[in-house]
Amino acid sequence: SRYVLLEFGPMDDYDYLRNGVYDLLSEGYFPIIAHVERYQCLADHVERIKDLTGMGAYIQVNAGSVMGNVGFGMKSFTRKLLKQELVHFVATDAHDTKKRAPELKKCADYIVHKYGNQYAEDIFVNNPEHVIRNEIL
C-alpha cells in the first residue's frame, strides 16, 4: 500500500512535521499521522491539522485519548477534531494485551452516539479497508 503511518517525536516542531508530510506526498505516498494529539506543536492547533489534511495527509487518533484515558487536554483536542471530521482513523496504540490492550468498543460506541454512524463506520471500517486495498480515501 502507498499509505505510510508516520510517528514523530512529541517535541518535534511543526515545520519538521510538515516537511516530513510534504516529502512523502512528493514521492507518491499517502501519509497517516499517528496520534496527532501527542505532538506539542499540534495540540490545540486545529488550523495546523487542517493545513496538513489540506496537503493530503490523513489523521489518526488513539481511542484512549478520545475517551479521556490520558488526560483532559488530549480528550478535548481529539473531540474537537472529531467534531470537525478531521479524523480519518482511530487506533488503540496497543503494544500487548495487558498494559495497553486493544480496546476500541467503548470509543466506537461513543463516536456513533456523538458524531453519527456513518462517520464512525468511515473511521473504523471503510478508511482502514481503503488502506489495505491501496485505494484512495
Locations of the language-model features?
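Charged helix-capping and loop-helix junction motifs
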Residues: 18-21, 44-50, 72-82, 106-107
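Short active-site-adjacent structural elements
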Residues: 67-71, 97-102, 132
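Extended substrate/RNA-proximal surfaces in nucleic-acid metabolism proteins
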Residues: 1-58
